[in-house]
Swiss-Prot record:
SUPFAM superfamilies: FMN-dependent nitroreductase-like. CDD domains: RutE-like (cd02148). Belongs to the nitroreductase family. HadB/RutE subfamily. May reduce toxic product malonic semialdehyde to 3-hydroxypropionic acid, which is excreted. Pfam families: Nitroreductase (PF00881). GO terms for molecular function: 3-hydroxypropionate dehydrogenase (NADP+) activity. This is Probable malonic semialdehyde reductase RutE. The gene is rutE. It comes from Escherichia coli (strain SMS-3-5 / SECEC). GO terms for biological process: nitrogen utilization; uracil catabolic process. Keywords: Flavoprotein, FMN, NAD, NADP, Oxidoreductase. It comes from the Bacteria. Its EC number is 1.1.1.298. Gene3D superfamilies: NADH Oxidase. Induction: Up-regulated by the nitrogen regulatory protein C (NtrC also called GlnG) and repressed by RutR.
């Protein structure tokens, strides 16, 4: 049986964590990005399908390729973030299932149903994006996830000729708390949950 993490860890991962819009000029190392992936890859996905693929944009040249896809409200915070992760999903993720899920012929579940494959890839890559956010927080980083961008432009600029499609963007770095907005409310248990 697992032990509960400390109250301090819960604060870091959830209750005190914020979505950041401003960033300190502290770089995020390639080693840290590798450490992030080494943590988040263990989060569960359906049949261990692991459809998410990540592009970590760290250079000015990479940010300029991304710029035309960004909405005006997401432009400045993305250009100044040390890292922007493109979270994509592989439309042919099932080709890795003989390696990732060798217990049966899971590949055929998806090759026989393109709709199931797309739904599975999108849903599970979204879950993996959440694991990446939690891994960032666990390593002392801050994040700013965004869906306000032109997906087709990102796909054309970064994934042309591939089986990858963009899902969302996540800015990653060390946040500038002076640029945080007031904390917004969340739905109560009664508003969001049911008990049967």
């Amino acid at each position: 049986m697992n032990e509960a993490v400390s109250p301090g860890a819960l604060s870091t991962l959830f209750t005190d964590a914020r979505t950041h819009n401003g960033w300190r000029e502290t770089p995020v190392s390639d080693e840290t990005l590798r450490e992030l992936y080494a943590l988040m890859k263990w989060g569960p996905t359906s049949a261990n399908c692991s459809p998410a693929r990540f592009v970590f944009i760290r250079t000015a040249e990479g940010k300029e390729r991304l710029r035309p896809a960004l909405s005006s409200g997401n432009l400045q915070k993305t250009l100044t973030a040390p890292v922007t992760a493109i979270v994509a999903w592989d439309s042919e993720f099932y080709e890795r299932l003989p390696q990732l899920f060798p217990h049966g012929d899971a590949r055929s579940w998806f090759t026989s149903s393109p709709q199931l494959a797309e739904e599975t890839a999108f849903r599970n890559s979204s879950m993996q994006a959440a694991y990446l956010i939690v891994a960032c927080r666990a390593l002392g980083l801050d994040t700013g996830p965004m869906s306000g961008f032109d997906r087709q432009h990102v796909d054309d600029a970064f994934f042309a000729g591939s089986t990858l499609k963009s899902n969302l963007l996540i800015n990653i770095g060390y946040g500038d708390s002076s640029k945080l907005y007031a904390r917004l409310p969340r739905l109560s248990f009664e508003e969001a949950c049911g008990l049967l």
